[in-house]
Every structure is written in C-alpha cells, then in structure tokens.
From Swiss-Prot:
It comes from Streptococcus gordonii (strain Challis / ATCC 35105 / BCRC 15272 / CH1 / DL1 / V288). Residues 514-801 form the UvrD-like helicase C-terminal domain. This is ATP-dependent helicase/nuclease subunit A. GO terms for biological process: double-strand break repair via homologous recombination. HAMAP family: AddA. It holds the Pfam family UvrD-helicase. Belongs to the helicase family. AddA subfamily.
Length: 1216
C-alpha cells in the first residue's frame, strides 16, 4: 500500500476545532487529538491518571497503519507482559473493525496483513525485545542462542555466593590484604562477620545492573563525590548557615523584647535573653569565622543552663500562657537549629582530618566490584544463564559495537514508542536512544505515577525531558493530558486539594500546578454528588497509643471499614466486587482476612506474600525429600513421621527415641527406629505390636522411595509420594484445599524445571531449597481460582493501572520505609558512592592508658550529600504512591488510618507557605496520615473536598456495624449449622431423623463427594436407574476369588492405551510454542517425557506436528501468552436425585483465555473409526469443563474442540 502523508499542524488544528464543535456525546480532547496525529519530532505525552493514554496509543498506531506504516515498522515497549497482551487485543479489535467497514480493497489487504502480523510485531516489554535481539545477534558476542533466564532470586543468590566466596579469598590473601581487611571491617557492623560486607557488595551490584554500562560507571562515577569534595566550600556553607541562624535568633529576641516581652518584664529569662543579645551584638558582617563559631558555642551553652530552661518563659497567669507558649516554641526551634549546626562543625573538623583515609578502601572496593561483576558474568556464561540486566547490557553492547545492526533497527522503525515512560531506568533509556534515529520517539507516561524506584526506575529521566521540551519546543513536543475520564468529580477534587498543598519541586520533585490538576473529562461524572464525597476516617482507639503498632492494621480500623462496606452493600446495593482495599505492603494483613471472615464478607487477596516454602503441605513434602536424601536428619524424619502420611503421635515418637542400642553412646532417630524393628533397643517392651506394624510400613515405604529416587526424576518421585500415601487427595480435603493442591502440583513442576537446568539430583535440589531459606528468600505463591463477587485486597503497587468503583486506602498511619537511608553505603547516579567511614581516631589519654585511639563512625561528605538526595527521592516517591492510590477510585474514595485524636490535635503542623504545607513539615512527616491531617488542620478555613471523621469503639459495636443479609436463604443456616451446638434437644432431633435422611438422600450417600468428569456418567447410571432401590443384589454380589498365579517376569508388560494417553498429554504440555515447533523440538520434548521407551515409540510425532498446521494449532501459536495447559480445577455440582452438592475435580488439557471468549481443547488417543463416536463419548465431559471455565472467569462464550490422535490421521473437531 502506498504511504500517505501525516497531518500538518494546521490540519490538526482544524480537526481539533471540528471535534470541539461536533455533537458527539464523548469527544476527544484537543490534547488527545494532538497526541494521536502529531509527527516529525520526538513527542512526550504527560498523561495524568485516567486520561486515556492507552486510547491515545492505540489510535495513534491505527492512524499510522492507515497511512501505510506496517506494524512491523513500529517498536512498542510496554511495562508488563500483561499490558502488551492487552494492547495487542485492542489493536486486533480496532483493526478488525476498520477492516470490516472499509470498502477499499488495497487498504483491506494491508489491514489483513497487519492483523496477521500483530502476533509477531515488536510489542512487548523491553526485556522480551532484548532477548529476541540476543537470540538473533548474540553470536557476535560469542553467546549461544539457547540461554535461559535466571528469574529466581534464590538461584541468583546461590551463584553470587559462590563467586563472592571465591573472590573474597583471593583478596583476603592478596597483596592488599591489610587494606581489604579494613574495608571488610568497615561494613561488618555488630555481626562481626563478612555478611555485612557481602550484603553491601550485592546492593552495589544491583545498582550497577540498572546502569547502561556497569564497568564504565564504576570508572567514571564511583568515586566522583570524593574526588570533587571541596572542604573550604563546605566550611563556607556551614559558616553561612551559622550566620543566618545567629542573626535570625537576634532578630527574634529583639522583636520579642520590644513587643509581647513587655508583659514579662523582670522575668528571669529576660536576663539570659539580654546576655545572649550582647554576645550576638558583638558580631558584625565582617567578623571572622572563629568569632561566629565562638558565639554559636556560647549561645548554645547558655541555652543549656538551668536545666535547659534559661531562655524559657514560665508563668502561672492563664492570660499569658498562649504568649509564653508561642515564644517558647519559636525559641526552641531556633536553638535546636543552632545545636545542630554546632554538632555539624564538630563533625566537620573530624571529616577534614580523616575522610581522605577512606580513599584507599574505596579504591579497593571499586576494584573488587569490577572483578565481582566480571567474574559473576563469566560464571553465568558457563551456566548459559543470565539475568535480565545482563541481556540488556549485551543488547546495548551489540548496538553500540556493531553499527550495521544499529542501522538496521534505526532504518526499520518508523517510530519508537514507549508506555509508562516514567518507570524507565537508564539501561532501558540507552536502548531506546540506540533504536531511535533521533527524532522518532513517542513517550507516554506520568511522573506523578512513578513508584518503582526500588526497581531502579528513575523518574528524573521523564522529568528532564518534560522540562527540556517545556522550555525549548524545538527539542521535542510536550503534550499534557489532564482530563480524567475514570473518576467522579469528588475523587478528582479530593486529589487536587491534597497534592496542590503537598507537592512541589522542593519536596516532591515536580510542581503540582494547573498543568497537572486533574479535570473531569467524562460529562456523566462531572456533576457533584454529596454521597460520593471523599472521607478521611481515623480510628480513635481507647487503647493506649503505645499498644497500637503503626506497622500493622488494627481490628478497630478494619471494623470501621467493614461497617461502611455493609452499609454500601445493604443500602446502596454495591456489589462486593466493586470494592477494593489498598495497603502499602503485602504483609501483616492477617487481621483484615480474619475480620472479614468473621462478618462473612468474601475477600480475595490479590497476590500474597512470597511464602510458598512456608506452606505446611510444602514443608511436609520438603522434609519427606530431605529424609529420602538422608534418613539421619532427625528434624526432617520427625516431621515426616508426625505428618498425616504416617501419623505418629508424641507418645510413639518418645518410645522410638528410647530405643538406643547398648553399644553406642549416641544415635540418630533413624538408627533407634531400626533398633526398634529388630528388638535391639534398650527398651524393646515399649514397642507394642500395633506400633511395630506402623514402623514396618514406614520403613518399607521409605526404602522403596529411596530406591525409586536413584533411577527416576524428581518429578516422578514427588508424584509417587503423593500416590503412595494419598497425600495430594488428603490436602485437597483440608480447608483451602484447592490452594494446597495447587502448591503441591507446583512443587512437582518446579522440581521438573530445576532438572531441566544444569542442576541434577535430589541432593542438589534439597541444597538449593535450604540455601533459599537460609538467605530468607522464598518462592512466589501459586494462584488459584477465586470467587467472582468478592472484595479485593491488594497493594498500591499492584493496583497501578487499574480502576475500582470504591477504594479504601488502609493503614494510612504506617510509617514510611526509611531503610535505605540507614545503610552504611548510599549510591547516587550523579555523585557516586558515599559511605559511613569507621576511622581510627587518636585521643589524648595518659601514657599508661591504652588504646591510644578509638574507632569512630563518621558520615563522609559524599554520604551526607547522597543521604539528602535519597531522602528527597524517597519522600517524593511516597507522594506519588499516595497519588496512585487516590486516583484508582471511580466513585468514592476512603482514606483510613488510626491515631489518638487528642495527640493529633496537640501536635504542631506548622504554617502554610505560599499555599503549601511548610517544607519542614512535608519533609519530616513519616506517614500518609500525617500529610492528610496536616492539610486538614493548616487549611481548615479552605473548603477541602474531603471530610475528616474520628470513629471510636462505641461506634463499632455489633449492632452498629450490622450484618450482611444473604440472598441465598441457605447461607446463614449453613454457617450456624457448621458450628458446635450445646443444644441437646436439637441434637436429639437430628439423631432421630437419621433414618429418614438416609432414605431420602440415599443417592447422595452412595455418591462420593469428589469425582472426576470421566467418572460421573458411569457412576450415575446404576444409581439413577434404580430410582432409590437397592443397588447391589445380594445373590449376585461380587466376591473376590483368591488367585495364586505367579507373575511371568520373562515377558514385558504390554503397553496400554492409558500409558500412551498419559505420555501424549505430558508431551503436549512440554512442547514450547513460542514459535512453531519443528521435528527436532518435538523429539527433544518427547525425550523429556517421563515414560518407558516402549510407550514413547507408540507416539506418532508426525501427527503432533500436523496439529500445528491446523487452524486451532495456528491460533495456539499466535496466542501463546493466553494459553493455559494442564490446569487443575474444582467446582461444586448438584446431584439431580438427592439435590446434594459434590465436588468435581479434574485437569483441563488446555484452553486459550481471551477477553470475551475461551477456546477449550482436549487431547484424545482412543482408537476410533468415526469421529462422531468420540464426540458422543466425550460431549458431556467437555460440557463439564466448559461449565468450570465459565464459572471461574464469568465468560459464557466457550468454543470446545477435541484433538483426535487415535485415528490414521489427526483430526480436530469442534463440539457443539
């Protein structure tokens, strides 16, 4: 298709006017139109929350495609894989719509090609692109294309520890071992071991990974702060601060004496004030530095006289107390400032003398980091496994060192687009620069929503471009989208009222002015509604405030939220699914879960703490594996014996523990167990016959597992344990069984993935797990199906990009995490490293007293500079986190915290400064709640768009909280019936009705509580056909006959259809489908299948390959990100005869999850003549699968397919 020209500025202006005067109900804004159609230069779109940035991106891409640009000519970077998938779906939908409406055949052909190319277009995360680039050009750096990604933090730590230990030993015995020993001691802290130093090395390494070139940054910036330190300039800064503080105090005292001080004439404090003024008056502008420092010292010393009250007004006259308090507060602030300056001078003198002594240590640290970074990289190369940061660095190296590759991409891409630009790090920015031709970048983001500093994202990359383009449009076009189409006006006004008083360049990194104000863009949400007014709710507990931890949420705080949720649900018919609770972190949310359960409100936590390895069922399995690996591990063996698999009680374990043999003084528990079995223990009489049978069963089972482990994979071993002891079924019957089974299933898959790597064997697997736990890491929890209509609980970070009708931001009083400001090392991109240096300071003692020096920790000047920088950055990010949380709400916003009303009212919140909270209050505040309360107090005369309300215990009684009235009449009864009852009469009534219930519900009694889909039809038929009559005829009842035939071991067992079917299912699960698999890939996948060779030979790989030639196979390949394979499910079904529920469990072979439909497919290896036979046989089974999916996702349109592999040719048939 011939390319069309892009709109000129004049044409864009005309389009904006046309849109503004049109009769459309929802019009595009002038800024949206400008962002969609502008071209010819770099463009930065600052898109406020809810301003339709995704709409703008999609429409811009569509417009470029309509002008003849191919989707393959666009580079589109998204922040997450999920965002990339959603963008592709939107593009598919929009292109399909345009294709359907178009009458131009040439355009239709072009659009059809673009639709087909979306799946392979460069739309995805930067990580996915750099992997693709490295697969293609990695050979230029000598890298193999079959590398894998080190995604597990635990595996990374293991490799890092190996490299660190090796390098540490080299340096510790090297030429500079004395300096190195001093370097290590500088960071050991109280632990007195090398873990403190190792922790700092890993922290520096993580920082280096976010730079575009770690080695270059080490050489150019690492020591920059120390190399550029100018002590004379710093001393002059302190002097200027001292001058300003002393003159300010002099003015304050003189003003006081000339005015309100007359009310206190003759008071003792005034003598001291006059004495201070004499000293201050001796100073002149040209006085020496020493004069100023001497007067500072004298005034501070005077302030400490009389127990620190020498300059304090004390009065018993009530009418003068307010004047006295005002003076005392002002005096206190100024004197504290002077004391801080005196301390700074004292510290500065030490720094001048000792800071340079730290340079040899820092030089060596730089060398160590350079060696560590390089050696660790070489170690990863031997494993052919890399971190995402490594992949990015390789990609940058290829683009920088090979101009022909760089030119290829710069010429290929018509435009380089990036979403969520505010969360870009320096590595990603360098990649974007190299892919761009210099004037074809399109960047969309919002600095107010940059909340990933802990991932090394740098919002200043966005901010620098914002300022540059704002000041000089020739450098690039700045477009600001501030209309919010998501939220009601009450949410927008509350957000504006908070941030225009909170955020500026000084504290917040941007000025929240008219440029950034949120404006209602949706006409239907622009009219005020009093019931949607934002609320600031504080739980005023009667408990002493010391007992309420700021870190956790109190039960009272949760109760006030529950009270409001019940009101919304009962009075305003708000669905639970429309309500979301936001917290700052994933941890310490147990109280929320418990309180919601108590009030029968469904709650779904969206992503819990990474505590997979701490789940009971997984811990039991890990102890089982430890015992198989080494039975002499007493802890693991005890855990296994006590588990539900073998159920040994405390008494039985004690009896075993007493079975020590006479010959040995010390024995492990397993050895004592063997003594018990052979009657060789000291107390054989304690081992009773039943007890001995349990021991024999345990011993037999354990030995069989140990034998099996020698010749089979971890995956097979784990499933053998599940099957031998029915452990998988057992945990499924426990509370939260679906989650527990998902955890066990994931353990087998993780073990399988582990053995796919270069690591092999049970011993190394156990070692890896133990190292993970030793380093206080864990693995991510496993997701499972959750109820549809439930309140959601998630972190603010998790909520970014989402929207919810009603939002409760909880635990507003939680103190900000200041951990990064207490580290002994602080890194700055501009200034390099800053450290706390432990110096050997000489002291004057009598000659006989030793030592003659002490170790003194001092904050070096670069450390102090970096600390101020990081404090500002941290506070600014907390402001942005609050902004993200507040702008998630569509209808109503609740800000919830806790605190003593009395104490909050007594606190000083400062004065307004140019319409904002004072800089000191904003920078010293430690929680969201303090910011909100300060704004409410300082600007109490303003008509703020949120209401403050304290809630007390008397407002949260059971009667006042209320209860949920379930629409299902059985729910409340069920909850009551499940509790223990002390009502004896009622219990007798139940007992008397047993016979009647047995008769009435015979079908349900005969029907097991848990079945699989394939068993249901076979099970129902005999029960339903009898219509309640006895199922088994006593005369023809089956009685097993003894069979003494010995097995013939000379003949190999015949391969069964079930074995082939299981192997085929495992094969289809293992085949990678990120691209069309060829025969080599299929053979490799088959080799990994855990089955006998005789079984594998029965599998026709040509049929498997032909599947990917079918329409369904092509759809799978094109939508691999939507594919779910071997997915377990569970759902309730109702027995038609008895009306009772039973649990249906099964595993789906696979399905594709789209936004509006699901494609379900099932593999069948049954032999057949006509496909209709299998359709009839499995129709009901697929219906059950479809019901399960429909219930889980709330999607009614489900396409069902059978993939038939048992005929002469492969067939894919759709089942209606």
């Amino acid at each position: 298709m011939r390319k069309k020209s892009f709109l000129s500025p004049e044409e864009i202006s005309q389009l904006q006017h046309f849109e503004a005067t049109s009769s459309k109900e929802q019009k595009r804004t002038a800024e949206q139109i400008e962002a969609i159609y502008s071209s010819g230069q770099n463009i930065l779109v600052s898109a406020s929350a809810g301003s339709g940035k995704t709409f703008v991106m999609v429409q811009r891409i569509i417009d470029q495609i309509l002008r003849g640009v191919s989707i393959q000519e666009l580079f589109i970077s998204t922040f997450t894989v999920k965002a990339a998938g959603e963008l592709k779906e939107r593009l598919e939908k929009e292109l399909s719509k345009v294709l359907k409406e178009s009458q131009d055949e040439e355009l239709k052909q072009h659009l059809a090609k673009q639709l087909a190319a979306i799946a392979t277009a460069d739309i995805g995360t930067m990580d996915s692109f750099t992997q693709k680039l490295l697969n293609k050009y990695g050979y230029l750096l000598g890298l193999a294309p079959n590398f894998r990604i080190l995604q597990s933090a635990s595996e990374q730590t293991m490799l890092q520890n190996e490299v660190f230990q090796q390098l540490f030993e080299q340096y510790y015995t090297g030429e500079q071992k004395e300096i190195f020993e001093k370097l290590v001691k500088n960071f050991t802290g109280k632990k007195k071991n090398i873990s403190g130093f190792r922790q700092q090395v890993y922290a520096i390494y993580q920082f280096l990974q976010s730079t575009s070139n770690p080695q270059r940054w080490l050489q150019d910036f690492f020591l920059k702060g120390y190399e550029e330190t100018d002590f004379s300039r710093e001393r002059d800064k302190i002097l200027q601060q001292v001058k300003g503080a002393l003159f300010d105090l002099e003015d304050y005292f003189r003003f006081h004496l000339d005015n309100e001080g007359r009310e206190f004439a003759g008071a003792k404090y005034q003598e001291n004030v006059l004495l201070a003024l004499d000293k201050l008056g001796s100073l002149q502008e040209l006085s020496s530095e020493q004069d100023y420092f001497r007067v500072l010292k004298d005034v501070v010393l005077l302030s400490r006289a009389s127990g620190g009250r020498a300059l304090t007004i004390t009065t018993r006259k009530e009418e003068l107390k307010e004047l006295a308090d005002t003076f005392n507060q002002g005096r206190k602030e100024r004197i504290e400032h002077l004391r801080g300056l005196e301390s700074s001078i004292y510290q500065f003198e030490f720094l001048e003398k000792y800071q340079d002594d730290s340079l040899p240590l820092l030089d060596l640290l730089r060398d160590f980091m350079s060696d560590f970074t390089q050696t660790y990289l070489e170690r990863k190369k031997t494993e052919n496994a890399f971190e995402f940061g490594d992949i990015s660095h390789f990609a940058i190296q290829i683009l920088e060192d090979f101009p022909q590759v760089r030119s290829f991409y710069q010429e290929r891409y018509h435009e380089v687009m990036v979403d969520e630009y505010q969360d870009t790090n320096h590595t990603q920015e360098r990649m974007l620069e190299l892919l761009s031709n210099g004037y074809n970048r399109f960047m969309v983001g919002d600095i107010k929503q940059s909340i990933y500093r802990f991932r090394q994202a740098d919002p200043q990359i966005f901010n620098d471009k914002f300022r540059l383009y704002q000041a000089d449009p020739s450098q690039g076009k700045l477009i600001v989208l501030k209309e919010n189409f998501r939220s009601h006006v009450e949410v927008l006004e509350a957000t504006n009222d908070v941030f225009k008083r909170l955020m500026d360049e000084q504290v917040g990194e941007i000025n929240y002015d008219e440029t950034h104000y949120l404006v209602a863009g949706n006409p239907t949400k622009a009219s005020p509604d009093p019931k949607n007014r934002a609320e600031f709710l504080l739980y005023d507990s009667t408990v002493a405030s010391e007992e309420l931890s700021e870190e956790s949420i109190s039960a009272g705080e949760v109760s006030l939220v529950i009270k409001e949720i019940i009101r919304l649900h009962e009075e305003e018919a708000v669905a639970f699914k429309d309500i979301t609770l936001l917290t700052a972190s994933r941890t310490r949310n147990d109280i929320i879960l418990a309180e919601f359960a108590k009030h029968n409100i469904p709650l779904v936590p969206d992503g819990g703490e990474d505590n997979y390895l701490q789940s009971v069922e997984v811990m039991v399995m890990l102890d089982t594996l430890r015992t198989i690996n080494n039975p002499l591990n007493d802890y693991a063996l005890t855990a296994l014996l006590k588990s539900a698999m073998f159920d040994f009680g405390e008494d039985e374990l004690a009896r075993i523990a007493l079975q020590k043999s006479q010959e040995k003084s010390q024995e492990n528990l397993y050895e004592k167990l063997e003594n018990a079995l052979t009657n060789q223990g000291l107390h054989p009489d304690l081992i009773l016959p039943d007890h001995k049978k349990k021991l024999e069963l345990f011993q037999k089972t354990l030995l069989s597992w140990r034998t099996f482990a020698k010749t089979h994979s971890l995956y097979d071993l784990i499933w053998k344990i599940y099957q031998d002891r029915f452990y998988y079924e057992y945990v499924g019957a426990l509370p939260n069984g679906a989650q527990r089974q998902a955890n066990l299933y994931a353990l087998s898959l993780r073990a399988n993935d582990y053995e796919k790597s270069s690591f092999k064997g049970l011993s190394r697997f156990i070692s890896m797990i133990d190292k993970i736990l030793e380093n206080q890491h864990d693995l991510a929890s496993v997701p499972y199906a959750a109820p549809q209509d439930a309140v959601h609980l998630m972190t603010v970070h998790k909520s970014k990009g989402l929207e919810f009708k009603y939002v409760f931001l909880l635990n507003m009083d939680k103190a900000f995490n200041r951990q990064d400001t207490s580290s002994s090392i602080i890194l700055s991109r501009k200034n390099g490293i800053g450290i706390k240096y432990i110096a050997d300071v000489e002291v004057e003692y009598p000659e006989k007293v030793k030592p003659r020096s002490i170790r003194l920790s001092m904050d070096t000047l670069p450390y102090q500079q970096n600390l101020e920088e990081i404090k500002l950055a941290s506070l600014s990010e907390q402001m942005r986190l609050l902004y993200v949380a507040m702008t998630r709400a569509e209808t109503k916003l609740y800000l919830v915290g806790k605190g003593s009303q009395e104490k909050l009212e007594k606190r000083s919140w400062g004065q307004a400064e140019q319409g904002l909270l004072s800089a000191s209050i904003r920078s010293q505040t430690t929680s969201f709640q303090d910011w909100l309360y300060a704004i409410q107090t300082v600007f109490s005369e303003d008509q703020l768009a949120f209401d403050l309300r304290f809630v007390r215990d008397e407002d949260l009684t059971a009667d006042k909280i209320g209860q949920i009235h379930h629409s299902n009449p059985f729910d409340a009864d069920d909850l009551t019936d499940n509790r223990q009852s002390e009502d004896i009469g009622r219990a007798l009534d139940i007992l008397e009705s047993v016979d009647r219930l047995n008769s009435q519900y015979r079908s349900a009694i005969e029907l097991p509580s848990v079945r699989t889909p394939s068993q249901i039809k076979k099970f129902y038929e005999p029960i339903m056909d009898t219509e309640g009559m006895d199922i088994i005829d006593e005369r023809v009842a089956f009685r097993p006959q003894p069979n003494f035939d010995l097995p013939d071991f000379s003949r190999k067992a015949k391969v069964t259809g079930a074995q082939v079917g299981s192997a085929v299912h495992e094969l289809m699960q293992r085949i990678p489908i990120d691209q069309k698999p060829d025969m080599a890939v299929l053979k490799l996948s088959l080799k990994q299948v855990q089955a006998e060779e005789s079984v594998k030979k029965q599998i026709d790989l040509n049929k498997i390959a032909s599947f990917f030639e079918t329409r369904l196979g092509e759809i799978l390949l094109a939508n691999s990100d939507k594919l779910h394979r071997e997915a377990p499910f569970a759902m309730f079904k109702r027995d038609e005869i008895s009306g009772q529920d039973f649990v249906l469990r099964g595993i789906l072979d696979g399905y594709l999850l789209f936004e509006d439909r699901i494609i379900l497919f099932d593999y069948k290896t049954d032999k057949y003549k006509e496909a209709s036979e299998l359709i009839a046989r499995y129709h009901s089974q697929l219906d059950l699968y479809a019901q399960a999916l429909s219930r889980s996702y709330g999607i009614s349109q489900i396409e069902k397919y059978l993939i038939l592999l048992g005929g002469e040719q492969l067939q894919v048939v759709q089942v209606d």
